[in-house]
Amino acid sequence: KFVVFSFEYMTRNEYLHTERFEFEGGGSIDGLKVVYHTSENGWRKGDTRKVIWICHALTANSDAEDWWPELVGKGKFFDTEKYFVICVNMLGSSYGSSGPASVNPETGKPFYFDFPLVTVRDIVRANILVRKHLGIDRIDLMVGGSIGGFQSVEWAVMEPETIRNLALIACSCRATPWLTAWEESQRMALE
């Protein structure tokens, strides 16, 4: 059976941070850019819709309607008309948010290996910048898969008064030594 999905209920947005962004592991950048997708009807002050914040997995992007078409969109489980649905592109990825392929304003060339090491806490801090920019005071449901799940856990620790509920997929609250070694071997393979 061939299924055609219509992707028209999420809108791409960009947030440009005007202050220097300091990374947890050291280093900083000016002009941090964070790309995100939201329900077509944006968030306004006094909005009463429930907020669903999706933290994507490593290889996805902020267009959750594109990679999760069965769940995100008008009339779907994460109904973009009934709820305010948002997904922020992960800091350091290649889908628009600042990362190694971004141009270093000091050199005029891509950062590549000079881009600061990005931690989960850095990713969450970039998400929090977008949350504050939009004026969102509460997140009714945060959904995160894989590294998005780790972001969700970290965010719940950083802002427990903001996050009401978590739905975590393929993640845990801590990494075992085996998992740490496995991830390091993957990182080494990429280098």
Where are these regions (language model features)?
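Aromatic (phenylalanine/tyrosine) cluster motif
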Residues: 2-9
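Ligand-binding pocket scaffold of soluble enzyme catalytic domains
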Residues: 9-191
